[in-house]
Each structure stands twice: as structure tokens, then as C-alpha cells.
């Protein structure tokens, strides 16, 4: 089929898919394919195929308008995924083109996709799957063409509204075809070097671009509200960051490359400049920066669940500390509990959180110190404790980390009569969170607060087994962590507003416990070992809401999914030893085995002093 025949077929034959509401949070950010729409910032040679330029002009030898690669190429390389490219250089939001009459625009692009592609475009199914990233760089030519053809400053808002409405028709159709993940470039052609000396042209283009981008934010906000993941990149902010610190981005000049012969033939020289020789497009190096910004945006949701998980793990560790104060003392150790004791416990814990569809792999670890007191009354004991901990969550490659200063208080109690025992704990904690994310050059940071609750109970019956005691045990442990909303500081093109969120866990367990009581050289040693089968009983699903600070109306919903609820094992062991009159040293080690969301390991070392 000829190129022109393909275009006509696409326009006439593509199905008009009705817009549908997704109505559920986005759940896929694992990109395995890029589908590109737009103009010369994304085009990989489609324009030259359509108009019959083969080979491409010398100034654009690769078919890209940078003389080398564009941001789609960079993104494809960073994500290691293929590209289906429908962008046409010079495309306007309608079906016209700045390069001349009869050359198609955005309408042809999206209709060609829905019609299955072919001709200058790749052959496709006409629908998207949940791991496709759909990119748009459209609207810049509308502003540029409007100014170049005599458009006025007063007429710019109305003209921009028409362009935005036209673009919306195409975006609506593509969302209806299943687009789940959108990346939208928001440019402003007023800042291009080609009109650097023309303030009148700058004013007209700026008015047009500002109104167009605002209208597109409203359109994109509607998709995000229906569950589509929308990443909005403000290229003006990116340009301001580069201009403020060009050397950090690898540039010696933020203007257009000159002289032209050297720029076209020497890519290393051209890439010292932000803009290419045409004063309109970025160099390959400039486009590389844009691709890196988008990749950083795509990474962000995969890190947002860590603060909540950190709060849960910190709460759970304090729960183990409180519970161990009963496990390691009288009357659980078989002795009679009398009077007051004070204790100091140091603890550490670690949890390797496995990668999922909603989060990248990260490690949680922390250390803490707990001080408290117990009071025993024969077959029972009660106690209180205060804790300070320094937990952190760190992603592989340090792409993001959350550090916390945490204060916790809690109470516990238990009794043991003959072989029967029961114990429980309750606690609360305050978290002072420092959240950091890696940027392209400047990183992002936020300080916020959180809190958490913890509670648990355990009961069982131990039978005499020779010189030991053993028997069945059941347990339940609950934790809930809240993280307040926060706004990041740092690179304004990447900073986020993140809404408050909460995470919860309810773990049930059943197993067996073995205890002993030995005297060795006058030292009383009382070890124990516990083996449990545990299972997450709470649904634990949660949805995070966030937006770019540059486009706060586009609020994305990110579903983290249910917590892993498969059976897993937990082995705990420890003991106490009386080292001086009224002074006991105690220790506990605990680890999970076969847990789907990553195993945790913890340890405690403490000393009790009785009065």
C-alpha cells in the first residue's frame, strides 16, 4: 500500500473506540514497550519516509531531528525495551504539518495506530497492554505555526484551546484503546533559540503554549482520575535547571550549535550544546537529558511504598522486643516472678523486600535501644518500655532511601499457671521521616512525620518432656503504620506531592515451643526455641496518590496490591543466664523462612537487673 493510501485508510477505516473509564488505580509500571506519538522531538524518520526523502537530509542523517538520537531512543535504551514509533516531524494536533500541505499530522498518527499501522509506521495490534508506555510530544508546532502565520497575542488563548480540544480527541481514542501509562512532554516554543531576539514572537508563543499546556493538564487529570498513570514533564523547568548549571548536565553552551558544518559532521562537538544547529531541536545530548528525566519519573512510583513498609517493620520489631520481655523472664521461664526489675535491650533487624509489580527491591534495616521495667507477682508479670530506633529503607543503587528517628512506648504482661501461659503487648510509635530520591542532577528530598500502632498476643500449653517443657503455641500480631503527606524539594521538574497513606498487617501463627532450665557451674541458663507457621491475614492492599509539583491537578493513583499471604515459617530462639545475683543476661534471635515478600532477621541482647 502506498504511504498516501495508508493515511487515507487509517483516517477512514480506524474504529472509533468509545472512551471508557478505567476507574481503578494504575497497577502496572513495568514498561516492556514504548509507543511514541507526536512531532519531530520523537520522530525516528517517519516524516522522511512519508515525503520520500531517502536518504534523509545531511543535516538529519539518522532521520531524527537532532542529527543523532532523540529522547525516545534514550528512553528505549535506558529501559531496554523496543519502540513502535508513530511520530511525524512537523505534526500539528490536527492533520496538518508545518513542513507543507498534504503532509499529515497527529490525527493520522493515532488513526494509523488504531488501524494496525503499516506503511511508514510499524505494524501493530491497534490496542495497548498494561505495560506499554505511550509517549506524547505534541502542541509545540501549533504554537510555532500560529505565531509564524500572523497569529496575535490576544487570539492565542482561543487558538490554543482549539488545538487542545483536537489533541484530546486523539488521546481519548488511545486511552480507550487501553493506554495505561502516559508520558506527556509539555514544551514552550517561546524559549527556542530561533526567536531569542524576537520578544514579540516570544510573547505570542508563550501565551499559546501556556494556555495549551494548562488545557492539556486538565485533560490528563481526567485520565489520572480514572486510573491511568500520567507522567507530565515540564520542559521549561528542565531547561531552567540546565541553564542554571550547564556543566553539571555536560554542556558548555545552552544555545544553538555553531558553526553549522562542524555541528553536522562532529557529534562530539555538537553534543556540547543544548540545541542543534537548526536552533529548534535539541542535540542528542539534550534529548538524552529529557529521556533521563522521564526514566526518573517512571521510577518514582516504584519507591513510594517504602516509608509505610518501614513503619510496619519498625512496629513489628518493637512488638518482638516487648513480647520477648515476657518470653525471657519469670514466670514464663518456670520460676516465680516477684518484685521489680529494670532492663536495657539493644536490638537490630533487617528485611530484604522483594521486587513486585508495584515496587522495586529494597532493604530495611535498623537498630534500637529499649529501656523499661517489669513488676512480677507470682504467676504474672507486667511491664512498660520506651524505645529509640534508627531504621532505614534503602533501594538497590540508592535510587531512594527513607531514614527515620523513631520513639516508641509500650506495655506488656503475661502469666503462667502450671503448663498454661498467655501474654500480650500494646505499643505506639512516632516516626520522623527523611525521604530522598535520586534525580538526574539534583536530588529530591522531603521531611514528614508518621506514627504506628502495634499489638499482639500469644498463648499455649507446655508439657513436661524429660528435663524440658514443650507444647503448642498460637499467636496473633497486628501493626498499622501511617505516613503523613509530604512535598519534595529539589529539582522542580521531578518533585512530587505525595498524599498521606497507611499500611497494616495482621499475622496469625501456630507452632510449638521448647524450653529448658539448666544450672551450669552455678549459673542458671534458661533457653527456649520456637518454630511457627505464620500467615498474613489482613488484605493489606493500599493505594498511594501523588502528583508532580509542576502539575498538581494530575493526581495519580498507584495500587501497591495485596500483601503476600502465603504460609511461611518463623524460627526464634534465645535464653537468659543469671550472671550475678539479681542480674541476668538475655538474647533472642529470630528469622522467617520462605516468606514471599522477603525474609526478615532480628536479634536482641539485653540485661535485667532485679531489686
List the model feature ranges, each with a label.
Residues 1-28:
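Gram-negative bacterial Sec-dependent N-terminal signal peptides
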Residues 4, 9, 14, 272-274, ...:
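Short, functionally important structural connectors and interaction interfaces within domains
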Residues 20-21, 49, 53, 150, ...:
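Amphipathic, positively biased hydrophobic alpha-helical segments used for protein targeting
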Residues 21, 49, 54-55, 194, ...:
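Residue-level signature of transmembrane alpha-helix interfaces in integral membrane proteins
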Residues 27-335, 346-355, 371:
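Conserved active-site regions of diverse hydrolases
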Residues 337-611:
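Membrane translocator/pore-forming domains, dominated by Gram-negative outer-membrane beta-barrels
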Amino acid at each position: 500500500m502506498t504511504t498516501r493510501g495508508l493515511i487515507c485508510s487509517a483516517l477512514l477505516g480506524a474504529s472509533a473506540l468509545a472512551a471508557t473509564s478505567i476507574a481503578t488505580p494504575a497497577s502496572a509500571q513495568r514498561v516492556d514497550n514504548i509507543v511514541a506519538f507526536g512531532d519531530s522531538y520523537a520522530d525516528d524518520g517517519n516524516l522522511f519516509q512519508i515525503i520520500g526523502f531517502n536518504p534523509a537530509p545531511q543535516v538529519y542523517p539518522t532521520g531524527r531531528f537532532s542529527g543523532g538520537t532523540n529522547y525516545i531512543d534514550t528512553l528505549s535504551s535506558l529501559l531496554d525495551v523496543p519502540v513502535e514509533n508513530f511520530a511525524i516531524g512537523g505534526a500539528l494536533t490536527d492533520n496538518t504539518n508545518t513542513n507543507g500541505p498534504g503532509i499529515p499530522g497527529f490525527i493520522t498518527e493515532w488513526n494509523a495506530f488504531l488501524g494496525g499501522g503499516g506503511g511508514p509506521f510499524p505494524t501493530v495490534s491497534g490496542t495497548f497492554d498494561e505495560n506499554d508506555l505511550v509517549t506524547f510530544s505534541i502542541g509545540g508546532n501549533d504554537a510555532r505555526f500560529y505565531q509564524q502565520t500572523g497569529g496575535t497575542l490576544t487570539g492565542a488563548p482561543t487558538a490554543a484551546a482549539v488545538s487542545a480540544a483536537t489533541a484530546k480527541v486523539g488521546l481519548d481514542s488511545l486511552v480507550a484503546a487501553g493506554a495505561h501509562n502516559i508520558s506527556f512532554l509539555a514544551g514552550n516554543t517561546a524559549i527556542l533559540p530561533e526567536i531569542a531576539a524576537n520578544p514579540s514572537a516570544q510573547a505570542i508563543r508563550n501565551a499559546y503554549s501556556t494556555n495549551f499546556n494548562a488545557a492539556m493538564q486538565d485533560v490528563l487529570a481526567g485520565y489520572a482520575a480514572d486510573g491511568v498513570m500520567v507522567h507530565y514533564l515540564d520542559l521549561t523547568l528542565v531547561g531552567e535547571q540546565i541553564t542554571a548549571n550547564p556543566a553539571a548536565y555536560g554542556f558548555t553552551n545552552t544555545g544553538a550549535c555553531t558553526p553549522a558544518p562542524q555541528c553536522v559532521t562532529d557529534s562530539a562537538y555538537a553534543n556540547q550544546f543544548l540545541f542543534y544547529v537548526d536552533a529548534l531541536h535539541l542535540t542528542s545530548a539534550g534529548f538524552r537529558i529529557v529521556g533521563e528525566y522521564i526514566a526518573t519519573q517512571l521510577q518514582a512510583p516504584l519507591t513510594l511504598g517504602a516509608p509505610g513498609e518501614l513503619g510496619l517493620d519498625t512496629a513489628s520489631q518493637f512488638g518482638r522486643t516487648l513480647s520477648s520481655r515476657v518470653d525471657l523472664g519469670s514466670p514464663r521461664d518456670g520460676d516465680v516472678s516477684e518484685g521489680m526489675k529494670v532492663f536495657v535491650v539493644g536490638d537490630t533487624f533487617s528485611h530484604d523486600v522483594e521486587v513486585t509489580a508495584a515496587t522495586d527491591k529494597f532493604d530495611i534495616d535498623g537498630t534500637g535501644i529499649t529501656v523499661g521495667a517489669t513488676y512480677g507477682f507470682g504467676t504474672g508479670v507486667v511491664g512498660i518500655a520506651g524505645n529509640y530506633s534508627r531504621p532505614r529503607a534503602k533501594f538497590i543503587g540508592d535510587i531512594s532511601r527513607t531514614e527515620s528517628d523513631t520513639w516508641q512506648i509500650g506495655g506488656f504482661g503475661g502469666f503462667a499457671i502450671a503448663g498454661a501461659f498467655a501474654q500480650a503487648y500494646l505499643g505506639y510509635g512516632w516516626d520522623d521521616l527523611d525521604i530522598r530520591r535520586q534525580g538526574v542532577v539534583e536530588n529530591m528530598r522531603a521531611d514528614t512525620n508518621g506514627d504506628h500502632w502495634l499489638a499482639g498476643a500469644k498463648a499455649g500449653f507446655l508439657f513436661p518432656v524429660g528435663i524440658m517443657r514443650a507444647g503448642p503455641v498460637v499467636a496473633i500480631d497486628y501493626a498499622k503504620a501511617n505516613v503523613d503527606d509530604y512535598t519534595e524539594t529539589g529539582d522542580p521538574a521531578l518533585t512530587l506531592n505525595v498524599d498521606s497513606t497507611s499500611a497494616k498487617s495482621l499475622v496469625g501463627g501456630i507452632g510449638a515451643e521448647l524450653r529448658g532450665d539448666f544450672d551450669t557451674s552455678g549459673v542458671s541458663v534458661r533457653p527456649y526455641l520456637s518454630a511457627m507457621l505464620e500467615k498474613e491475614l489482613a488484605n493489606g492492599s493500599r493505594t498511594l496518590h501523588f502528583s508532580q509539583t509542576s502539575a498538581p491537578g494530575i493526581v495519580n493513583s498507584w495500587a501497591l496490591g495485596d500483601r503476600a499471604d502465603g504460609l511461611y515459617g518463623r524460627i526464634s530462639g534465645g535464653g537468659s543466664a543469671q550472671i550475678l545475683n539479681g542480674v541476668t543476661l538475655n538474647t533472642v534471635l529470630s528469622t522467617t523462612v520462605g516468606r514471599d515478600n522477603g525474609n526478615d532477621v532480628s536479634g536482641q541482647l539485653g540485661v535485667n537487673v532485679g531489686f
